[in-house]
């Protein structure tokens, strides 16, 4: 146990003195000629003085330490009731006063030796108990300043019982108490080794500057870093530097693979053998964990024991990460891979995600987690997340996607919802309070978007109050009278316009029906054919259907920036120094393969707050409860989606049916598929 600070350590100094006295009388006992009455008398006088000091020490402890502790803790009692100091003093007095014949003297000497041996065997453990049990209790029940005051009184009382020489000697001993305690605790070899480490020389590694040591630490794996942190305080601080813990792979580490580099260099497709072993480990561990009353004498197979042991090792490693490492380095973690974990749980994942707000790559493939794993995700909690793999997490539901959408935040283009607060002269504090909502629909004002009636309505644009944006050919922008009410900028031969609020035809009539970006070309044309539109006469309105065919690639539209009438409203989001357009909703990879409880509701939750403008990879294989309508609504807000990396069930008639890659779970033995068993 580590020593306590010297100024509040109540036992080490006095106990060192007591141990020194024990050593002295043991030495005298072995060197005394008991057949010589003078030698025996000198020994008894020395023992009498020694035990009087023991008695004085006991009284000081009772009055200034144990007595105070008993006032605050009722669990402390009878501490010094059985040390037999008084009986020993009576024994010494009897030996000094009575004149004995030779026979009685031999019996007395034998009794003296036995009683001293018994006392010594009890007294030394008693002092150790006080140091290891009562000192921590005192630190718990008394403040630091109270402990310092008690220490001063204890020292003063011990010194008051000695003459000037003893006083000076005692002060010197107590000042060196901590080092002397170490001398008693460790062997001669350990002491020599410790002293050699503390002696600094010009060639010692401890003389290197921290920058050089940190550079050396970058070549160490996580296991070596943990060992280095136990060397001394300086190394412990360096080992907790965030840059050394950017990539975490606990599942690999628990199995002896201490890789800690970028995930790009890992094989993302483990073989079936590896997956099968992880499944066996998980199953064996769950069966063992569920039966807490299992008979230890019951024989289990060697392979099952190995699986349980491996899962237990993984669980211990995860707990150590959560309690001892992530609180210090969590903000620097970019990669967290727990794919095929045997022992992880929703609670552990939730704690890890709370400590790691700047994650970019999260892989929870085939883990036994539920929606509660993401309870810690508040608004904007993972704006930097680029990659999330939830393949095989068959317990998650639409609630997880709602939380993910909330945590991804809102890009600057969608913060126009705050203009309502701005126009009502609401304070910045009111806006910030709204940002703390757990529902992105509440933050953006799109609370009706979770309603099935909303998505069943063909004219969805009427429920969105932000000014519409129109895209048309810059070679024919429209009438000059109309252009007076427009604000536009040219990008790649296109005009991107936003209409001023004064143009009322954009809040009702034909103009309000056009919502490029929420409708595909085909969907928009079908809607216009079916809707009864009373045209207002604007050239722009008449050109809408014509110019919709000239839209550029989705990636070009994503990079076009527009400014509204109040676009320089104060940014109320954390990290406002950097562009939200770049920071928020940066997700590029989303895999929900085998998550069969996901429905259209969850997919549509991802469309709120700006959709997923940078999403390139979307895997919905085995999501049996989604429909073509839900897929269409999500894809419409994912302009960067690559058809080659777009997977969904072959039985669903959805978007990009001719070019999408279909279902990946066909003939898969461990993930949901509607054709399982074929």
Swiss-Prot record:
Pathway involvement of the protein, from the record: Protein modification; protein ubiquitination
Region feature Disordered, mapped onto this chain: 285-308
GO cellular component terms given for this protein: nucleus; perinuclear region of cytoplasm; SCF ubiquitin ligase complex
GO biological process per UniProt: intracellular iron ion homeostasis; protein ubiquitination; SCF-dependent proteasomal ubiquitin-dependent protein catabolic process
Subcellular location: Cytoplasm, Perinuclear region; Nucleus
Gene3D superfamilies registered for this protein in UniProt: 1.20.1280.50, nmb1532 protein domain like, Ribonuclease Inhibitor
Region span, Hemerythrin-like: 1-159
Biased composition (Acidic residues): 287-306
Post-translational modification: Ubiquitinated upon iron and oxygen depletion, leading to its degradation by the proteasome. Ubiquitination is regulated by the hemerythrin-like region that acts as an oxygen and iron sensor.
Positions contributing to Fe(3+) 1 binding: 15, 57, 61, 130
PANTHER family: F-BOX_LRR-REPEAT PROTEIN 5 (PTHR13318:SF19), PARTNER OF PAIRED, ISOFORM B-RELATED (PTHR13318)
UniProt remark on domains: The hemerythrin-like region acts as an oxygen and iron sensor by binding oxygen through a diiron metal-center. In absence of oxygen and iron, the protein is ubiquitinated and degraded.
Protein name per its UniProtKB record: F-box/LRR-repeat protein 5
Organism: Xenopus laevis
Gene transcribed to yield this protein: fbxl5
């Amino acid at each position: 146990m580590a020593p306590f600070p010297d100024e509040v350590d109540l036992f080490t100094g006095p106990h060192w003195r007591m141990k020194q006295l024990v050593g002295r009388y043991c030495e005298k006992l072995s060197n005394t000629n008991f057949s010589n009455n003078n030698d025996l008398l000198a020994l008894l006088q020395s023992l009498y003085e020694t035990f009087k000091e023991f008695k004085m020490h006991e009284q000081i402890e009772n009055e200034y330490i144990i007595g105070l502790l008993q006032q605050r803790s009722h669990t402390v009692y009878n501490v010094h009731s059985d040390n037999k100091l008084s009986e020993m003093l009576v024994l010494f007095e009897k030996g000094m006063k009575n004149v004995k014949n030779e026979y009685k003297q031999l019996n007395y000497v034998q009794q003296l030796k036995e009683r001293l041996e018994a006392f010594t065997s009890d007294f030394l453990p008693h002092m150790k108990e006080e140091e290891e049990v009562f000192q921590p209790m005192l630190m718990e029940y008394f403040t630091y300043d109270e402990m310092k005051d008690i220490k001063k009184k204890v020292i003063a009382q011990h010194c008051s019982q000695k003459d000037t020489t003893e006083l000076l000697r005692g002060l010197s001993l107590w000042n060196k108490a901590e080092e002397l305690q170490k001398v008693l605790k460790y062997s001669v070899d350990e002491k020599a080794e410790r002293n050699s480490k503390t002696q600094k020389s010009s060639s010692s590694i401890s003389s290197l500057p921290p920058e050089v040591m940190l550079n050396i630490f970058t070549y160490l794996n996580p296991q070596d870093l943990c060992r280095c942190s136990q060397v001394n305080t300086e190394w412990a601080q360096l080992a907790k530097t965030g840059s050394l813990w950017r990539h975490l792979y606990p599942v690999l580490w628990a199995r002896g693979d201490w890789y800690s580099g970028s995930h790009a260099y890992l094989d993302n497709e483990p073989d079936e053998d590896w997956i099968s072993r992880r499944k066996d480990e998980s199953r064996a561990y769950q069966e063992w964990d569920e039966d807490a009353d299992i008979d230890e004498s019951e024989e289990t197979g060697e392979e099952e024991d190995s699986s349980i042991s491996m899962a237990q090792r993984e669980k211990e490693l995860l707990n150590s990460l959560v309690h001892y490492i992530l609180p210090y380095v969590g903000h620097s973690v970019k990669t967290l891979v727990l794919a095929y974990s045997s022992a992880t749980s929703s609670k552990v994942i939730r704690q890890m995600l709370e400590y790691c707000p700047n994650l970019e790559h999260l892989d929870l493939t085939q883990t036994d987690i539920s929606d509660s794993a993401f309870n810690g995700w508040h608004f904007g909690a993972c704006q930097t997340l680029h990659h999330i793999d939830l393949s095989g997490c068959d317990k998650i539901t639409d609630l997880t996607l709602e939380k993910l959408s909330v945590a991804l935040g809102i890009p600057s283009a969608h913060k126009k919802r705050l203009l309502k607060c701005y126009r009502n002269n609401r304070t910045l504090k009111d806006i910030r309070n709204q940002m703390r909502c757990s529902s992105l629909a509440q933050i953006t004002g799109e609370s009706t978007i979770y309603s099935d009636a909303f998505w069943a309505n063909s004219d969805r644009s009427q429920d969105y109050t932000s000014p519409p944006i129109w895209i048309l050919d810059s070679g024919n922008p429209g009438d000059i009278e109309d252009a007076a009410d427009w604000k536009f900028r040219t990008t790649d031969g296109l005009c991107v316009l936003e209409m001023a609020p004064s143009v009322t035809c954009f809040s009702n009539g034909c103009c309000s029906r056009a919502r490029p970006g929420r409708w595909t070309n085909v969907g928009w044309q079908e809607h216009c054919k079916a809707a009864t539109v009373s045209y207002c006469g604007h050239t722009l309105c008449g050109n809408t259907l014509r110019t919709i065919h000239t839209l550029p690639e989705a990636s070009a539209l994503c990079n076009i920036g527009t400014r509204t009438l109040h676009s320089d409203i104060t940014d109320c989001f954390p990290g406002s120094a950097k562009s939200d357009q770049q920071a928020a909703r940066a997700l590029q990879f989303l895999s929900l393969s085998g998550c069969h409880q996901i429905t259209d509701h969850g997919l549509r939750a991802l469309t709120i707050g700006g959709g997923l403008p940078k999403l390139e990879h979307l895997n919905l294989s085995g999501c049996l409860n989604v429909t073509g309508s839900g897929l269409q609504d999500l894809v419409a807000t994912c302009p960067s989606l690559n058809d080659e990396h777009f997977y969904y069930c072959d039985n669903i008639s959805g978007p990009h049916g001719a070019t999408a890659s279909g279902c990946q779970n066909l003939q898969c033995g461990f993930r949901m598929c509607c054709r399982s068993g074929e």
